[in-house]
Amino acid sequence: MTTNIHQHRILILDFGSQYTQLIARRIREIGVYCELWAWDVTEEQIREFNPSGIILSGGPESTTAQGSPRAPEYVFNAGVPVLGVCYGMQTMSVQFGGKVEDSTEREFGYAQVEIKAESALFRGIQDSLNEQGKPSLDVWMSHGDKVTAIPEDFITIASTDTCPFAIIANEEKRFYGVQFHPEVTHTHQGQRILERFVLDVCQCEALWTPASIIEDTVVRLREQVGEDHVILGLSGGVDSSVTALLLHRAIGNRLTCVFVDNGLLRLNEATQVMEMFAGKFGLNIVHVPAEDRFLTALAGINDPEEKRKTIGRVFVEVFDEEASKQAQVKWLAQGTIYPDVIESAASATGKAHVIKSHHNVGGLPEEMKLGLVEPLKELFKDEVRKIGLELGLPYDMLNRHPFPGPGLGVRVLGEVKKEYCDLLRQADAIFIEELHKADLYNKVSQAFTVFLPVRSVGVMGDGRKYDWVVSLRAVETIDFMTAHWAHLPYDFLGRVSNRIINEVNGISRVVYDVSGKPPATIEWE
């Protein structure tokens, strides 16, 4: 009998904060399942979810504006604890008769809150004693409006010099509001506060662990597919790799993996994928060499968006052809993860603006008529990595820098040719190798090389050469929504440049990209 890892669950209502997914990840780290829903859910949906507690997120709106979002009334009638964060605290205050006003003194960044009263949520949690000898917390604020009068039956737990109601509580109903963001690392005791809310106030058990997730997923996969066969497109990336191992554990050789070698992979990647999954793990893999087909389809195409669509279209064609050979297959597996589900839901509202086609999302023909299996759809990326480790995948593989779905197709600028891909593969391998040797690889968030379709004059020995240019790119980021270019040491960059120019015949110049995001994107295309 497996543990019901969804037995205790937290519902997070999203009011639009940039940090909302971070709240969910923090709750999962505590070991408790949670889901993230839009703020305008119905009473029926909340009842069906049956949460042990509810968190109201922050958001960019103002409760003083007409028509601003409000928490559904049932949230406060469900008989479970509620934690309002920033905007969530403000809307809770207004809905219970308190007042919120636009503040002339906005708080963005570090603040110190002084704890003035006992609370079940904060008992024993503090960073230091302030000058008056009162316990205080170092927190991260990000708000313009502030509560100026708290509702009846609420008390003030803590305040700052400019925010008289930084923490409020109705202890009897177990309703709490914090004006700061406990989910960000800048709030030093933030994780302890969330743990106290989830484990003590909501009385959840920490059942959400990698081992229990694997056990639960295997049981559910067996229930879903029965004795049927499943097909999966295996890329060697984290998501498809973990999906493959979960399915293999659940149904064994009734899983067929199709590995499409499109000629746009990193150096020796196809060999590594086959050795790892067919060799070490014993998976049933169909290896499809399709470099010529992809490069032929890409010939003459310079537009980045058109390249992406072409790569996606050809992949679907190749995969469809292989799938049609597997007559016994009834299910298609995909490595969809929870942020993909959230993003798709947001796109369905019409509020999302497409900057680029998503690197890792594609469609398959409806005529395939296969059922869909998505073992990772409840998981964040960091959870997928932890499960991969538990399943025996190497740490280095699970923690490689992101690689786009179209591969080198979006790292060769302009038209994609075999010559360009071969040069880029060699140059990129040198860059990554040197990052590892200098212990810099894990200190940057993403690093790669871009092929520029321009020639530059160089000197080699006594002769001139007129060869291609590549750019090195390395960034530091927390969420990949914004990024700073990495300040790699000059001597390191010089060493990489020398190796590439001397070892890769056809490249005469190496440059380093010092663009941040925004205004640039991380990938060049």
UniProtKB/Swiss-Prot annotation:
Output the Gene Ontology terms for molecular function.
ATP binding; GMP synthase activity
Identify the EC number(s). Answer: 6.3.5.2
Q: Where is the Glutamine amidotransferase type-1 domain?
A: 9-207
EC category: ligase
Any one GO CC term of the record: cytosol
Give me the reactions it catalyses.
XMP + L-glutamine + ATP + H2O = GMP + L-glutamate + AMP + diphosphate + 2 H(+)
Q: Which HAMAP family match?
A: GMP_synthase (MF_00344)
Query: Which protein are we looking at?
Result: GMP synthase [glutamine-hydrolyzing]
Organism equals: Photorhabdus laumondii subsp. laumondii (strain DSM 15139 / CIP 105565 / TT01)
